Each structure stands twice: as structure tokens, then as C-alpha cells.
Amino acid sequence: MRLLETIGYNDKIKVIALIGAGGKTTTMYRIASCLNKIGKKVICTTTTHILKPKEKYPFPVLGTPMKDNPEKLSAVSVEDYQRICKEYDVVLVEADGAKGMYIKLPASHEPVIPKNA
């Protein structure tokens, strides 16, 4: 679980937000897989938009289906976010959209990092 060491993970960490351009979703799923392997109850979500996973993971990926783009998920409600923070050991949040670009300049409303991250 070298990845967990690299990011400085410890048992006190409850919410991890991923920001920046390129690689957030892949990194989120890799971290979730590592946490799952050490017995943590983990869930992935977003405060922006993510593509629906194409493969099945051993952990849930939660988002609100987008009406205008069925391939994507958007943020869950505040109530659902608060619920999953109570129900899961670790919540991983993709908190910054980059639309697949490897470099970006954030807008004034970005990133959307949860207060408890």
C-alpha cells in the first residue's frame, strides 16, 4: 500500500478531495482500491462531474445521474453527502473538473472542496 504512504494517509483521515487537471478519477479509484484492500469501507463521489465508471469496482461510486449527459454523474445532495460521511470509513471526492484536459486554469468557483476534506 505504498500509494497510501505516499499520500500521507492515516486512520484519522475521513475525507480526501482530489483536485487539479488530469488523472483525478484514476487516482481516486486507485486510492479507493488500496483502502478497500486494507479493510476500509470506502466510497467515491464528486462535487463536480465525473464519468460513470465503465468497470465494476469493489466499492460504490455515488453521484446524481445527469439528465443532459447519461454518461456522467454530478454531485450528490448535501444530505446524501453527510450521510455517506457517517456511513463510510473514508470518502474520496473528485472536487475539481478539468474536462479531460491535462492542464487547466480554475474558474472563480473552483475547486469545490468539501469543508471536511
What positions do the PLM features span?
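A short, flexible low-complexity segment enriched in Lys/Arg and Gly/Pro that occurs
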Residues: 1-4, 74-76
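Walker A (P-loop) phosphate-binding motif
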Residues: 2-38
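Short coil/turn segments at beta-strand junctions that form active-site/ligand-binding loops
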Residues: 14, 39-41, 87-89
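General beta-strand structural signal in soluble alpha/beta enzymes
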Residues: 18-19, 42-47, 62-64, 91-97, ...
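N-terminal phosphate/diphosphate-binding loop that engages ATP/GTP or pyrophosphate donors
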Residues: 32-71
